[in-house]
Amino acid sequence: NKEDIHILVGYKQEVNPIWYQNLHTVHGIVHFIQDERLTTHYLPSIRPHLIKKFMMRNPQFLSEYIFYHDADILFGNLPLFEGMEDGRVHVSRTPYIDYSYIISKNSPSLIKDLVDIVGIDQETLLKNEANTGGAQYFFKGLGYSFWDKVERDCEKMFRGYFDKLETYKDEFAASGIDRTKYDFQIWTTDMWVVLWN
């Protein structure tokens, strides 16, 4: 149903007129929201930024279930949403962001820094590892303050990672693995931050 689909589009100075020309092809309600982020080290932080502003302007959606996902996916079939309306947050399974993945980088400072930014303890992550997920979310009641913290934590985590990257590489190399083989999926920052908040 077109009225149930809300597409959030960010813009900096003004909306490109081409968007208006092509709105008739869009299968949903388009909301143009100005990108007023003060920090943009982590470009995907635009997502929580747009969502927090949308929720502030549309508080009626706090009592609605929302299916949030990126625009670059295609569904063969939609999930059975009715079976998911149980007050919990549902996520797609994404083992590439679970606790074991982070620990596999052999960097005690890395995991400590990541959890400290969000304010969660490692024991909670380990206990809930089987529930790790992201990329697509089904939730209710996550408003402005939640998404504002997610936006701020994304920027802190991403920037903090690069500020201490050499330390993480040193710890990785100290475990006997070639320092040049170090890699870490920091692009998933927002997935950790949403999950851990």
Describe these PLM feature segments.
Residues 1-197:
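Glycosyltransferase catalytic domains, chiefly GT-A lineage
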